[in-house]
């Protein structure tokens, strides 16, 4: 596949596309070579706007391509010579930032408050999504479209502000983390540094979703007791009371890196990104799904009875197709994600659904499939214009099958009267795909050692190739057959991972760190940091799934960008790496802020002196909290109590002057019996600015109270 490699030695005047030659930094970054496919930029909107703050909005694209961009420039008084560029998980929309509310989530407001202009693009266009087997040049979406926008933004910025070459920093999470890493590894002189976050590894897709599918099905009714064991004041033994099969599945998922406390979302988290990966998986390795049920060494062949009561093969007819407009009118939820599609890491893949009102999103069948546990399947068309085709089913609602990520043209061919089969056989087969994807031991994936014999050989038959690296290469823009992520880059990087992340298990950040260390050696500490965020999930949004359990990590990302710019521009080293160890797939951090390091505060809460208190109705419980910030990383600016699980944190603690250590004490009585998990949410800010909505680093402390 043809690739345009980004060179590192072209003069700045050539990059500037006929812009005037301007003085550069004393030690300038290498100039970014012009990509010939993006040689004709144009601007179709150029205007000043007042929301969320005063800025100049510039929209345009590149002739001969589908790439579109938006630039958001502050006035000269607020510009400090840099830009921040967000990279979405998949090619999306260049106007996403305009839809974000005021406050912490607003990328335009944050960038301008940080002296930067902001860049976003459509990633080259929706048609450029990288998947194995797609005919398009996946380097466009991986990094070239974003690089072209970054290069051209400097032309516009220099014309507006004059002065020196703007420094540039990119950030992106999940699939956008892959694209961010690919961007810095494949180029030189475009970005001076990057902040990838919730980053996976080349072995992540689809394997870290397949183990999740299996665990969700087999442990479905056991999660309440598993969670109770690992909650504050619990037994600490999540395996107690499980059958041998259930214990084996939980142990397997845990060793693969799934954070046990994060199973609290078992009812709502669904299959997540597997909805987008399944189509590529089926295209690249279709034989697996027949081998699974027909060949020795595969669970479906060797022990098919374990799927009794779960396997669904239901023949029916189509009563009527349902369009997106009709679904909305009937208040039928057909989204494959919870919440709004805004390019965030928890929902960007849903953009692949499309949005047109006439798009077919579901079918009403002539009968309702029998009720079984169902986390996805196929609608196999047996007659009509689409005979022989299959569409992914996200879920079943009585006699309505709701589609997942599908080919809209195929869905439109299916008419009333066509015969179809609802079949979840492939999704059941996918549950153990990771058994048959054991990487070489030299690739440093100890999480797969559980699928090897004592002499290091795979226990199960292996597929002809490893699928994960193919998916990843299509996202990072590396040639197939070469390492998708090398750890070799020019610039500086701060990597942010989350300890409760159930989509990108945090051990993968350590995997990439080892790649960086192998390439940079003694220079690693001068160019790389990794920060782990406790109580944080995958999604990059201010509102998290359960606020009494989890916190937003947006403040960590924002501080990482600010620290990165100081590191590059002024030589000010950022705070140290989080101290951690990886043990059986789990990332474990020290209990105190001083030992943990990184930038996140640590809140230690007690109830009547312990992690668990047992009291009578109306009897006051005495809560104490010690809050510490790692040295030199900020001051505590807020502390909020939520005693009864409302998720609103209604009790605001009165703080002394902002400081790096705070001790709190409060009492609360419960009016009803039950089990409560009171939580204290705290936030630090680098300068102790309690009024700023940005770069507030959050954490939680929790205890258990049993009221009799």
Where are these regions (language model features)?
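Gram-negative bacterial Sec-dependent N-terminal signal peptides
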Residues: 1-22
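C-terminal His-loop and adjacent cap/lid subdomain of alpha/beta-hydrolase
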Residues: 24-640, 646-696
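Short beta-strand elements
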Residues: 692-708
């Amino acid at each position: 596949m043809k690739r345009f490699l980004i060179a590192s030695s072209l003069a700045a005047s050539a990059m500037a596309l006929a812009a005037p030659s301007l003085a550069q930094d004393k030690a300038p970054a290498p100039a970014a070579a012009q990509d010939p496919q993006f040689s004709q930029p144009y601007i179709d909107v150029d205007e000043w706007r007042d929301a969320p703050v005063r800025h100049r909005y510039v929209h345009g694209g590149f002739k001969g391509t589908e790439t579109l961009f938006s630039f958001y420039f502050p006035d000269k008084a607020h510009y400090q010579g840099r830009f921040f560029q967000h990279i979405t998980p998949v090619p999306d929309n260049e106007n996403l930032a305009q839809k974000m509310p005021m406050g912490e989530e607003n990328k335009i407001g944050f960038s301008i408050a940080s002296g930067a202009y902001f860049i976003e693009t459509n990633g080259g266009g929706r048609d450029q999504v990288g998947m194995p087997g797609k005919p398009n040049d996946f380097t466009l979406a991986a990094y070239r479209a974003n690089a072209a926008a970054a290069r051209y933004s400097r032309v516009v910025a220099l014309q507006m502000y004059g002065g020196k070459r703007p420094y540039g920093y990119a950030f992106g999470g999940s699939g956008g983390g892959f694209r961010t890493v690919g961007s810095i590894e494949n180029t030189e002189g475009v970005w001076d540094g990057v902040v990838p976050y919730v980053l996976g590894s080349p072995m992540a897709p689809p394997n870290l979703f397949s183990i999740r599918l299996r665990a969700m099905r087999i442990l479905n009714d056991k999660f309440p007791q598993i969670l109770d064991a690992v909650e504050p004041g619990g037994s600490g033994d999540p395996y107690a009371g499980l059958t041998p099969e259930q214990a084996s599945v939980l142990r397997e998922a845990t060793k693969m890196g799934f954070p046990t406390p994060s199973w609290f979302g078992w009812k709502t988290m669904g299959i997540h990104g597997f909805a987008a990966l399944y189509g590529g998986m089926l295209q690249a390795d279709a034989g697996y799904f027949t081998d699974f049920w027909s060949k020795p060494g595969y669970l479906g062949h060797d022990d098919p009875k374990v799927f009794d009561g779960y396997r669904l093969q239901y023949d029916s007819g189509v009563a009527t197709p349902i369009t997106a407009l009709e679904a909305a009118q009937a208040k039928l939820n057909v989204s494959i994600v919870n919440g709004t599609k805004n390019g965030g890491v928890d929902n960007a893949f849903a953009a692949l659904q499309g949005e047109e009102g006439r798009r077919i999103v579901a079918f009403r069948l002539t009968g309702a499939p029998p009720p079984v546990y169902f986390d996805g399947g196929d609608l196999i068309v047996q007659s009509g214009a689409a005979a022989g085709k299959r569409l992914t089913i996200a879920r079943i609602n009585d006699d309505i099958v709701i589609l997942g990520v599908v080919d809209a043209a195929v869905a439109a061919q299916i008419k009333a009267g066509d015969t179809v089969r609802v079949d979840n056989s492939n999704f059941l087969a996918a549950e153990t795909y990771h058994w048959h994807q054991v990487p070489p031991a030299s690739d440093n994936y100890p999480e797969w050692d559980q699928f090897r014999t004592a002499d290091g050989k795979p226990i199960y038959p292996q597929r002809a190739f490893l699928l994960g690296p193919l998916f990843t290469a299509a996202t990072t823009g590396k040639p197939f057959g070469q390492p998708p992520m090398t750890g070799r880059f020019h610039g500086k990087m701060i990597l942010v991972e989350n300890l409760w992340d159930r989509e990108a298990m945090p051990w993968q950040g350590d995997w990439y760190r080892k790649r960086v260390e192998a390439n940079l050696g003694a220079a690693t500490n001068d160019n790389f940091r990794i920060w782990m965020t406790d109580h944080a999930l995958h999604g990059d949004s201010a509102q998290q799934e359960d606020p009494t359990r989890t916190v937003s990590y947006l403040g960590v990302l924002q501080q990482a960008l600010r620290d990165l710019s100081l590191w590059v521009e002024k030589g000010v080293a950022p705070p140290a790496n989080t101290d951690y160890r990886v043990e059986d797939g789990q990332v474990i951090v020290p209990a105190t802020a001083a030992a943990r390091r990184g930038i996140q505060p640590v809140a230690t809460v007690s109830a009547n002196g312990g992690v668990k208190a047992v009291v009578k109705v109306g009897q006051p419980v005495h809560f104490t909290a010690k809050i510490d910030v790692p040295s030199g990383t900020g001051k505590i600016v807020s502390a909020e109590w939520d005693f009864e699980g409302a998720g609103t944190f209604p009790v605001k603690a009165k703080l002394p002057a902002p400081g790096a250590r705070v001790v709190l004490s409060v009492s609360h009585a419960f009016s009803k019996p039950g089990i409560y998990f009171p939580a204290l949410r705290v936030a630090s800010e680098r300068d102790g600015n309690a009024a700023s909505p940005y770069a507030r680093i959050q954490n939680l402390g929790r205890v258990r109270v049993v009221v009799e």
